């Protein structure tokens, strides 16, 4: 095992050394020369010409480009890229996942790869997990890009279409992962070129995904869906929510314990599934007065009852979702603890939860467009990722995305001390110990950050801390509006912060607090200008440096007063003094209140302490009542506590326990990886179909009139061939052909052929019959062109193709949803569900294409042009 670990370490070290030799050293050698260049934008434009006109590759110009970008950072925003940041920039350019510790400056690192790849003129995207980080990143780095002559934009949810178009037309665009994915889907539903948000050419060229593990692994199972209301009654969910209260939860069958399951249903917490027993089926059939719950006409009932039980037993308020002020069920992201407005559980589960909570049930939605992040980001010509924790998931990044992970060295040595876990028998014993440790730390003035896995836990601990007289702040899905402000000050002395799943929070915790953040907020609140306005930015930086010029720079801001400047200077002085005090006390102390299913989430929490060489420490408190331990850990550890006669207040601190926890986490990670891989296998079937439809649709939307006309004629010819294959197959004698059926099908679609002599097709070979019929239909198309004029016909064809494709694709997605939901039952019939799914999905797609061609033919020949508008 150690050999394998050493090999991994050696490979990483070898790659780092190679980048130092080929990138870092040459860039450093150019630094003095680059500092003499007056016009950095002109020099960068010259590199752009070399790439776009001179045939040089991005690798050819990487060294001079990085030198210019570093100098632009130094001049414009006062930040010079460290050598380790150059390593990170090179890794991102290579399309790798760069693992960088918290506080190592990922935002600045990204400017290297983004600016370099922008030289191609095809657009680059910096993808973040929320709007706040996208806006801050764009505004913080905007001046650097503009110094190089590059344009930078922000694409956000509330923008008008023309604003989005301008943002995506920039060299570099900052955008959230969800908005980017939805823009892609919306563009593939657009009815005109003018309605496109993203670039018409090269919309997905290069992207850097921040918090890449959160987006591409944690959110991989959640597809992006654009939906419309489907006409379906929802009141039955209330009926079934009441009905299942009359059912009894039982225990599953277990070898050596019970041969048969008990009760009316059993639950599988690990797989988040429920199983209705034979007794339960009989009871439900009796309550509903139906003979067979699983007969075809009752499948909807069986599905809704199953979802009602899942909603009752497996999805819990304040942990999996919250109810907002408007009575809406809002999902909580299990990995980040963030609320996700607009997201809904699929397959009727969301409606079942709404019925359980007795709030208004929203109409079931019909999918209009959908894609998973797994398949979306693989559409890019090249993409890279940044995160503080990726190495543990390298196998998944390699298997699914073809991206390896490079661990970037830290600029300063990490001083954080990570203690062994303390394991308690019960949750209450654990919480009491946490409160005691917080009290001890708080008494010294040392800041403490407590990480919890749910809102329920954060509120329980908050109550306990309040009872102990310890002032604190709470950060969870209910208080996201104050998120950045709370996190920014979590490093001040005496501060105690409870945070639900710190993963992806995106704001650095600075020891002593973040004076720049507070000052920026004050400027926006009291002076009414953005903290990123040049005059405000210069003032904030001068205050941060305790520069005597701060007073002069401050007075250039409209509305500024001497009193405000004095308060800002005092704030900075207090922050500097507090930072020194906190460092002396040992830095930020992290307390984890339970181990997460993923080691990455635990590592992200630990990583909040010890940034940029600061001191810090961490410890996790675990109990055998925690979900991870209860479901996955080894029973031997519990037995050992029993033998030792340990009470609730006595912890174990042993490597055996830590090992058991890590094995449990590894098992869960493997299971989740298998689930995501299986999801990808199923989604790949849909992905190929989506790629085909979207590519054809894009050709219709953006192609010249002659191409649209050619596509239309091709579809009409295919329709004719299809009818011939059905009614007059070439391997049959013409005497056996169903000429009446052929005539009915063709004339229904092409009424202009009503006078055509179909019976005469029997005289001659099948090929001659095909030629005659295709020629007659082509003549009808020419007549249609003469009737409407070429311009009008092409407008009609474009409109018809888009409308028909969209309608059939929507219906196909619904059919695929139904197929996917029911395919698991095939396993009971000894058939492989995936093979069955792939076979049936392909047949459904081919049938859709045939129906699509049929409808296009009918609309082209029957529709009046005036009806299109």
From Swiss-Prot:
Swiss-Prot/TrEMBL catalytic activity: ATP + H2O + cellular proteinSide 1 = ADP + phosphate + cellular proteinSide 2
Positions of ATP binding: 85, 103-107, 508
SUPFAM superfamilies: Helical scaffold and wing domains of SecA, P-loop containing nucleoside triphosphate hydrolases, Pre-protein crosslinking domain of SecA
UniProt-recorded Gene Ontology molecular function terms: ATP binding; protein-exporting ATPase activity
Principal subcellular localization: membrane
PROSITE patterns, per database record: SECA, SECA_MOTOR_DEAD
Highest taxon of source: Bacteria
Cellular compartment(s): Cell membrane; Cytoplasm
Xref: SMART domains: SecA_DEAD (SM00957), SecA_PP_bind (SM00958)
Keyword Translocase (UniProt): yes
Database matches in PANTHER family: CHLOROPLAST PROTEIN-TRANSPORTING ATPASE (PTHR30612:SF0), SECA INNER MEMBRANE COMPONENT OF SEC PROTEIN SECRETION SYSTEM (PTHR30612)
Quaternary state and interactors: Monomer and homodimer. Part of the essential Sec protein translocation apparatus which comprises SecA, SecYEG and auxiliary proteins SecDF. Other proteins may also be involved.
Primary role: Part of the Sec protein translocase complex. Interacts with the SecYEG preprotein conducting channel. Has a central role in coupling the hydrolysis of ATP to the transfer of proteins into and across the cell membrane, serving as an ATP-driven molecular motor driving the stepwise translocation of polypeptide chains across the membrane.
Protein name: Protein translocase subunit SecA
Phylogenetic lineage: Bacteria, Thermotogati, Deinococcota, Deinococci, Deinococcales
């Amino acid at each position: 095992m150690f050999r394998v670990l050493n090999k991994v370490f050696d490979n990483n070290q070898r790659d780092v050394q190679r980048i130092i030799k080929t990138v870092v050293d040459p860039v450093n050698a150019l630094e003095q020369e680059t500092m003499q260049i007056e016009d950095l934008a002109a020099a960068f434009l010259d590199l752009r010409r070399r790439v776009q006109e001179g045939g040089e590759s991005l690798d050819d110009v990487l060294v001079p480009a990085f030198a210019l970008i570093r100098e632009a950072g130094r001049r414009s925003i006062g930040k010079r890229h460290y050598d380790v940041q150059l390593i990170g920039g090179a890794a991102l350019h290579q399309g790798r996942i760069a693992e960088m510790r918290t506080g190592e400056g990922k935002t600045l690192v990204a400017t290297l790869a983004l600016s370099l790849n922008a030289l191609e003129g095809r657009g680059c995207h910096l993808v973040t997990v929320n709007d706040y980080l996208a806006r801050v990143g764009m505004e913080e780095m905007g001046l650097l890009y503009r110094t190089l002559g590059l344009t930078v934009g922000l694409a956000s949810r509330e923008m008008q279409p023309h604003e989005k178009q301008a943002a995506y037309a920039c060299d570099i665009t900052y955008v959230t992962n969800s908005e980017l994915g939805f823009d892609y889907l919306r563009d593939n539903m657009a009815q005109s070129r003018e309605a496109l948000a993203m670039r018409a050419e090269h919309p997905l060229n290069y992207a850097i995904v921040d918090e890449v593990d959160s987006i591409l692994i944690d959110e991989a199972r959640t597809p992006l869906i654009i939906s419309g209301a489907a006409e379906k009654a929802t009141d039955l969910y209330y009926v079934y929510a009441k009905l299942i209260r009359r059912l009894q939860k039982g225990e599953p069958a277990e070898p050596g314990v019970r041969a048969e399951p008990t009760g009316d249903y059993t639950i599988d917490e690990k797989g988040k599934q429920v199983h209705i027993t034979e007794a339960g089926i009989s009871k439900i059939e009796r309550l509903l007065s139906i003979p067979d719950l699983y007969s075809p006409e009752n499948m909807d009932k069986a599905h809704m009852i199953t979802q009602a039980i899942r909603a009752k037993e497996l999805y819990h308020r304040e942990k999996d979702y919250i109810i907002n002020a408007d009575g809406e069920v809002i999902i909580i992201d299990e990995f980040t603890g963030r609320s996700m407005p607009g997201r809904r559980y699929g397959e009727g589960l969301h409606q079942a939860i709404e019925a359980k909570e007795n709030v208004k049930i929203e109409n079931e939605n019909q999918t209009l467009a959908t894609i998973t992040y797994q398949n979306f980001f693989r559409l890019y010509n090249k993409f890279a990722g940044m995160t503080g924790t990726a190495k543990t998931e390298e196998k998944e990044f390699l298997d699914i995305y073809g991206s390896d992970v490079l661990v970037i060295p830290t600029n300063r040595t990490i001083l954080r001390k990570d203690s062994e876990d303390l394991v308690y028998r019960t949750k209450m014993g654990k919480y009491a110990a946490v409160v005691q440790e917080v009290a001890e730390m708080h008494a010294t003035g040392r800041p403490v950050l407590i990480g919890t896995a749910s809102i329920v836990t954060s509120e329980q601990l908050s109550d306990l801390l309040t009872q102990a007289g310890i002032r604190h702040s709470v950060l969870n899905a209910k208080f996201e509006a104050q998120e950045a402000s709370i996190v920014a000050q979590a490093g001040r002395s005496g501060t105690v912060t409870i945070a639900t799943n710190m993963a992806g929070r995106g704001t650095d915790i600075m020891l002593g607090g973040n004076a720049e953040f507070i000052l920026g907020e004050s400027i926006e609140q009291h002076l009414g200008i953005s903290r990123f306005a040049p005059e405000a930015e210069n003032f904030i930086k001068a205050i941060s440096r305790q520069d005597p010029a701060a007073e002069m720079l401050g007075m250039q801001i409209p509305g500024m007063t001497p009193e405000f400047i004095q308060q800002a200077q005092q704030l900075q002085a207090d922050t500097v003094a507090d930072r020194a005090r906190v460092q002396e006390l040992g830095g930020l102390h992290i307390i984890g209140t339970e181990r997460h299913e993923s080691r990455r989430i635990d590592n992200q929490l630990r990583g909040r302490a010890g940034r940029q060489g600061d001191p810090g420490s961490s410890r996790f408190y675990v109990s055998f009542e925690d979900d991870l331990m209860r479901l996955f850990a080894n029973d031997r550890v519990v037995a050992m506590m029993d033998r030792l006669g340990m009470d609730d207040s006595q912890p174990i601190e042993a490597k055996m326990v830590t090992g058991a926890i890590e094995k449990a986490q590894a098992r869960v990670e493997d299971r989740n990886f298998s689930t995501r891989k299986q999801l990808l296998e199923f989604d790949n079937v849909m992905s190929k179909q989506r790629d085909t439809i979207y590519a054809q649709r894009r050709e219709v939307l953006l192609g010249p009139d002659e191409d649209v006309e050619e596509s239309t004629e091709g579809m009409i010819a295919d329709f004719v061939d299809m009818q011939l294959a059905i009614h007059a197959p070439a391997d049959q004698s013409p005497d056996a052909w169903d000429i009446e059926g052929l005539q009915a099908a063709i004339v229904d679609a092409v009424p202009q052929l009503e006078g055509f002599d179909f019976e005469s097709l029997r005289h001659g070979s099948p090929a001659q019959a095909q030629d005659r019929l295709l020629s007659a239909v082509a003549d009808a198309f020419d007549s249609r062109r003469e009737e409407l004029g070429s311009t009008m016909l092409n407008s009609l064809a474009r409109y018809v193709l888009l409308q028909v494709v969209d309608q059939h694709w929507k219906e196909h997605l619904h059919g695929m949803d139904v197929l996917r939901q029911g395919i698991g039952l095939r396993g009971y019939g000894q058939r492989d569900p995936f093979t069955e799914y792939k076979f049936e999905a392909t047949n459904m797609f081919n049938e859709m294409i045939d129906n699509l061609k049929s409808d296009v033919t009918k609309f082209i020949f029957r529709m009046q042009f005036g009806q299109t508008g």
